Each structure stands twice: as C-alpha cells, then as structure tokens.
C-alpha cells in the first residue's frame, strides 16, 4: 500500500453474512468470516472492515438485534488487531438489521466492546432508509440526528453514492453523483461539513469507467 501511495485501505465483508439468522451454523460461519477478515485486515494494515449485520426475517427484529449483539461479542472476544470493525447502515429492504440510527446505536450500546466498533455511513442506503440528503438543511438535520443518536466520534467512513431509487424506497440502487435522486446540493454540504473532516470518503458508484468523473465532482464540490 505504501508503494501505491494508499494511506488507508478498507475491506467490505461478504454479503452472505447474517448474524441475525435463525440458523446457528449460519451465524457461526458469519462470526468466523468477520473475525478472519479482521485478522487479515490487520495483517495487511487496513484501516477498517465494514459489514451489514444481516436479516431477522425468521426471528423478528427484537430477537435479531440480540443475536447480532451476541455475534459482535464473539467476534470481538480476544481480538487485539488494528483493523476496526464498522457497521454499515443498510438500505432497509425486508427485515434487515441496521437500517436506522436507533438500531445501530442499540448494537453499539449492547455489545461488550461496542465502544471500539465504528460506523460506515452509505449515503444511498441512508437515503433509501428515510434519511433525507437532498438539500443543505436536510443534510445538516440528518448529520445532527446521527450525532445525537450514535455520535459523530463513531463515524469513520462515508460511502458516497447518489441514489437510483426514490427517497425512503428501501432499495439498494447506487447511481453516479448528480445523476440520481439525491443530487449535488446535498453532497456539496456533506463534503463541506467541518464536523465530518475526520471521515474518509469512498465512492461505490456503479460504473468503474465513470468513477474518475465522480471523484472530480467531489473535488469540485469542495
């Protein structure tokens, strides 16, 4: 990474992970995969590993949250690595865990080592889950709500994506910056907030060939 001039690298855990599954073997496999990824990330010098907690469709939200907390405790038990675990906000499809600030806060508060776990804020997922990011005022309100509910000290990285799907649609559909339902006004405010100056930005827009243009858009907004 040093040779490639990469200061901070991040890992995304596999999408099949489900700490809220009704099946014990799925939960255990998910725990092992995340722990292995954390250890691997530490060995590689990666900054953090983000993951989606999973779906509670077979057990209900209350039980699902308890299972995720149990999973987090097992993942973090004895862990001494440098790669930080991050919960990424979800778009809210089905019975997923972690599609609201309140649910993420409950996971961090409930886990034994929750103070060591951070958050990845994906703009498209948040928008699809009902957090408005289209205007200066709506972005400021959303970030204020995040700070009040979770705490900006827990926010480590932003996945910066416009949204192909409508506001509060609960659909995970990324779009290139300025071409989606969020628009550039919100992103201009987001990248200019001093309260987020400590946060890294990662683009997850769909077409690799157009991502350089998205990067230029972000730089111009600043």
Predicted regions and their residues:
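Active-site beta-loop-alpha junctions enriched in small/polar residues
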Residues: 14-16, 54-56, 88-94, 124-128, ...
């Amino acid at each position: 990474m040093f040779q490639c001039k990469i200061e901070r690298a991040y890992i995304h855990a596999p999408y099949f992970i489900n700490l809220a599954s009704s099946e014990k073997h799925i939960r255990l496999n998910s725990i092992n995969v995340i722990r292995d990824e954390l250890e691997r990330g530490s060995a590689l010098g990666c900054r953090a590993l983000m993951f989606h907690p999973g779906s509670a469709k077979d057990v209900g939200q209350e039980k699902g949250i308890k299972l995720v907390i149990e999973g987090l405790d097992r993942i973090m038990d004895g862990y001494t690595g440098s790669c930080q675990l991050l919960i990424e906000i979800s778009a809210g499809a089905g019975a997923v865990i972690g599609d609201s600030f309140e649910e993420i806060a409950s996971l961090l508060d409930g886990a034994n080592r929750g103070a060591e776990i951070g958050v990845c804020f994906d703009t498209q997922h948040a928008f699809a889950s009902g957090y408005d990011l289209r205007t200066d005022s709506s972005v400021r309100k959303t970030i204020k709500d995040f700070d009040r509910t979770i705490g900006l000290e827990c926010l480590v990285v932003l996945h910066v994506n416009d949204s192909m799907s409508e506001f509060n649609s609960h659909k995970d559909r990324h779009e290139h910056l300025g071409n989606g339902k969020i628009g550039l006004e919100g992103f201009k405010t987001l990248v200019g907030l001093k309260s987020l100056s400590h946060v890294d930005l990662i683009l997850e827009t769909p077409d690799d060939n157009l991502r350089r243009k998205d990067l230029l858009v972000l730089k111009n907004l600043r």
